[in-house]
Each structure stands twice: as structure tokens, then as C-alpha cells.
Amino acid sequence: VEKPSPRKKGRPRRGEVRKPKTESRLERQCRQSAAEALAELPVCCDVGTKKNSQGYKESWRGYKLHADVNDCCLPISVELTAASLHDSQVAIPLMKMTSERVDYLYDLMDAAYDAKPIYEVSRTLGHVPIIDKNSRGKDVIPMAPHEAVRYRERSVAERFNSRLKEEFGARNVMVRGVKKVRLHLMFGVIALFADQVLKLIS
């Protein structure tokens, strides 16, 4: 299979006609419904390796669970994808799913979600996006003090992930196939939800 020639940089020459830039998945998700966007995402079991920001190799095998969690550590929307899929690719459909289920104001996300379409969709839904800036090798303006205080609430998402792995069986998944893996993880999510509700009312 021949690879397409790379897109030329800079201004086009006089009379030169260039193909329009290919629409990215995030740009496409802006006009799609949550169901349409999720249908495009890969859900196969895959294997891969990459270098992280510190230069160390990270490997993965299997699937990745994405969750939208409220400030009480209750999961509102959950989706399973291939492990190699970048977190930002699931942000927009999860925001749309959650907005259909509950009313909320702030979208708190880490630097992996620092992308223009995500900001745009968040504002279109009537939310306030507070997303940590991805420096991409450049200096960034720090968050305003009031945003930094609100951003601390994002720790509940990390707490949810930690509890799901350590207390509710997501660390060791001993089944194969996307349906069985999803069922295994969703039992853990339901149990965590019930446990958290009991903690809140007691």
C-alpha cells in the first residue's frame, strides 16, 4: 500500500491547488451525536508500546475504560475502547452522554484533553471548560487562581480509577473478548457506585 505524499507546508504557489485538510476525528465529533461518535471508536483488543514524556517505554495490551465522574466520585458515563486510543478521542461523546443524563457546569480535564474542539463543544453545551494546558514544549500561562481551586476537584476521577482497580476487580481481568471484559468492568462500576452512594448517605 502506497503512503500518501505529505502535505506541503507554507503558502501555495500561484495557480497551485491543494487538497483541503482532512477532517480530524475530534472535528467530526463536534457535529455527531454521542452514539455516532462512539460507533467510530475502535474496541478491539490491541497491543502496543510508546515512549512517555520522561523517555521511558510504556506497553499496553487489551482495552481502556473511560469514565465521566461527578464531584461525589459517582460515574455518570462509562465507555470501553481499545487500549491504544488516546483519551481525548472519547471526551466529546462522553460530555454529550453525561449532559443528556445530568445537569452540570464544569468540565475538568487534564492536559491530554487540551484541544480546541473539546473547548468548543464544552461551551456549546453551556459548560465551563477548565483544562490543564499542554505545553507542547512551550511556556504556558498558568491557570487563574479561581480555576486552579476548582481544578483540584478533578482528583475524584483519579480516586475513581484507583478504587475501581484496587477494590473492584479492574486490575486483573481474567476474561477475553470485548463483551466479557465490558461486563466484568461494569459489575465493578455498579458495585463502586453503590458503595459510594452508601458512603454519602451514611
State where each predicted segment sits:
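Generic secondary-structure signature for well-ordered alpha-helical cores
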Residues: 100, 166-169, 195, 199
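Charge-patterned, long linear interaction tracts outside catalytic cores
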Residues: 176-202
